[in-house]
Amino acid sequence: LREFFLMVFFPAFLYNGCMDKKKLLLIDGSSVAFRAFFALYQQLDRFKNAAGLHTNAIYGFQLMLSHLLERVEPSHILVAFDAGKTTFRTEMYADYKGGRAKTPDEFREQFPFIRELLDHMGIRHYELAQYEADDIIGTLDKLAEQDGFDITIVSGDKDLIQLTDEHTVVEISKKGVAEFEAFTPDYLMEKMGITPTQFIDLKALMGDKSDNIPGVTKIGEKTGIKLLLEHGSLEGI
């Protein structure tokens, strides 16, 4: 599998033809597009073309992308998308992401044009049935590290913070379309007092309301961190 990705996928991700530094930019397209949509939601009626198509997500996504390309200067880039609601996780747990509000039609109608935008920019995008963008990003991150890349991951999903290490920076989108919080192992330790591995354990203890995953009763972030600092790991607890 590793050789397949290195020979077939990574050459296809080549963005600017510069291989002086092997820098891979991995973008959670579904998450970033959703953030872009809501960043400009208050101006929804302003972002509409002559055909009646809303364009706020398209515009916001392009703006985010332009800022990232200028700042990160990647040699390779891939935008990963979710392939649908049915994944191996829903087969394991039927209520996974249950109870979420319906995706706004104004956002849904723009999605094909975001992919078209990427095509026109010469940026590869990818999705895989039964898997989420997170899974693609996590897999490629580890494979790229083995091949000597430095990686920047961009998402609105904090779950991906677990991937940060000496070669991977995880940037979480914040307000607007150009503000990100960059997580490294040192910054995670400074902000939360835990390691990336402990971050995984913390998520297991807390659960995730946004994904409808229950956690341990009465354990929130503060209590979870306290337990991990006392016992080291989930297994230690």
Residue ranges with predicted function:
Residues L1, F5-L6, F10-L14:
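Short hydrophobic targeting helices and cationic amphipathic motifs
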Residues Y15, K21, D45-K48, G98-I237:
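Extended two-metal-dependent nuclease catalytic cores across DNA- and RNA-processing enzymes
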Residues M19-R124, K175:
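Domain-level signal for Mg2+-assisted phosphodiester chemistry and nucleotide/NA-binding surfaces
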